[in-house]
Amino acid sequence: MPRMAMRREGFRPPPPGGILASEPKGAPTMAFRCDLILRDATLVDGTGAPRRRGDVAVRGDRIAAIGDLSGMAADREVMAGGRVVAPGFIDAHSHDDQAVLCGPACMLCKTSQGVTTVVVGNCGISLSPVPMAERPPAPMDGICAPEWWIFDSFAAYAERLRASPSAVNTLALIGHMSLRIGAMGRDTGRPATDKEAERMRKQLAQALSEGAAGFSTGLFYPPSKAAPTEEVIAVAEALREHRGLYVTHMRDEADQVLDSIEETLRIGRAVGAPVIISHHKCAQPENHGRSAESLALIERHAAGYPVAFDVYPYTASSTSLAARPPRADVPVTVTYSVPHPEMAGRALEGIAAEWGVDLAEAARRLAPGGGVFHNMAEADVRRILAHPLSMVGSDGGPLAPHPHPRLWGTFPRVLGHYSRELGLFDLETAVHKMTGRTAAIFGIPDRGVLREGAFADLVLFDAATVRDRASFAEPRQVAEGILETWVNGQSVYTQSGGASETPAGRLLHREAPETV
C-alpha cells in the first residue's frame, strides 16, 4: 500500500481550536520515515524528571525516537508549539469492566482525559469468573448491567476483549465478591467454609494463570463484609505462586481506618503480595484530619514492604446508597435508582422532604441505587494526593446516569486545579503520579514513560488551560485542554473531533519481580 502524503498540523492559541490541519504538503525525501512526529513539544516523560523541549516520533505502536528530529519525516506531523507531550495516563482504579467491552466510543469519558490504560476488577468486583443469572447484589449491580455477567472464566473475558478491543488498554484484577458469590451463592453473610475458600483460591489461581494481574477485595461491602481476615488470606494464597497484587477497598475508611490498614498489610505480608490501598481517604466528619495518622502508619509499613495507594482529587465519594446509613451532616446526591430513575441527580434530603420521610427511609425506597457522598475534608485530600506513595485513580462508575464527576474529570483536575492553580506539586510530579509511578507499581512494562522503544501511549495537552469541566451538577462534561490522545500509536481522541472508533487498546499483563 502506498504511503500517504505527509500532513503537517499545528495549534493556534487559546480558544478550543484543538488540532487544526493545514494543507497537506508533499513529503520530502528522508532517510528514515515514521508514521507520526510530534514537533516542538514540551516533553514530560513520566519519570518525574524535569521537562525538556523536543520532538517525538512514532512508528507502528512504539516510540521510534525522541529529541531533535528535524531530519526525519512522517505521514503525519503535529506542531505542538510548546504544548505538553506526556505518556498516556493510567487510571489506577476504574470500574470500566463492562465499558471496555462496549466499543471504542464507550471510553470517551477516559480518552478525553488523556487516559490510555485502565485497571478494572477493583473493590472486589469483576465480571469474571462467575456468571450470574439474576441481578447481582449492591454494589455489584452499579458496576455492570445484569446481562454482562456471563463470563465463567477470566479466559472468556479476555477473549471477548481481544475479539472486540476497546479504545484503551486494560489490566484486570479478580474480585473477591465475585468469587464469594460463585462459591457461596447469595449466602454471603457468614464466613466461607474451608471448602468454599479453597474453591475461591483455585478459581483465583486459574484466573491469574490466564492473565489476571491480581486479587481485589471490597471488605466494606455486604457480599464480603462477613469474610474474616483468615478467609481472605486463604483465598489470596494464590497470589504467591503467580506474584499477583493485593488491591483492596479496605474494611473501613472511617472510624476504623487505622485498624483496616493493619489488616490490609497483614493480608499482603501473609501471602507475599505487594499491597495497593484503593482510594485512600478518611471519611465522615469525625475523621477529618486523620490522614496525618493514616499516612504515617502506611509509611511505617512501606519502609519494609511494597505498599502504595491511589486517590481521586475530590472531597466526595460515591457508592451504593445502602453502604452506610445516611446522615444529615453528609449531603448525598443520587447517581442512580432502579425503582426511581427519575431521581438521578437529586439531593437525598430533597427527596426525603418531598416524600415526607426521613433520610434512611428515602434511601431504602431508592434502592437499589447509588449516591455521591460529601464526606471528606479538602485538607485530607491534598495531604493524601501530595504524598509520594500516591498515584491517581478515578474510581468512576460509567453506568450511572448522573455519575460522580471523577468519571470525566479526575486527571485534568489533578493537572489544572491541584498542580497549576494550587501548586500542590509541579507538573512533572503530577504526570509521574498518573503514568510512570502507576506503571511501575502494577508491573506494566514499556508504558507510562516517554522513551525510545516504549509503547506509543501518548497525550498532548495545554498545561496553561487544561482543567476539568465535569461538576457535581453537570458531571458528563469533556475536559478542556486535552488536545489529542494516542493508544499504541493510534489516535483515539481529539479535542476537535471527539472519540474515534479505533479499537487501539490491548489486554495487558503484569510483569512482576521474582521477590517482593
List where the protein language model places each region:
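Short acidic, glycine/serine/threonine-rich loops at helix termini
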Residues: 128-135, 181-187, 229, 258-262, ...
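Divalent metal-binding pocket/active-site signature
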Residues: 206-264
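Glycine-rich tight-turn/loop motif centered on a GG-T
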Residues: 138-150, 186-194, 224-225, 247-248, ...
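Active-site neighborhoods of metal-dependent hydrolases
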Residues: 158-161, 167-194, 198-221, 269, ...
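Alpha-helical scaffold segments that flank or form the walls of functional sites
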Residues: 99-173, 192-210, 233-241
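Short, ordered loop/turn segments at secondary-structure junctions
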Residues: 123-124, 220, 250-252, 280, ...
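Active-site microenvironment of metallo-dependent hydrolases
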Residues: 3, 7, 12-54, 59-62, ...
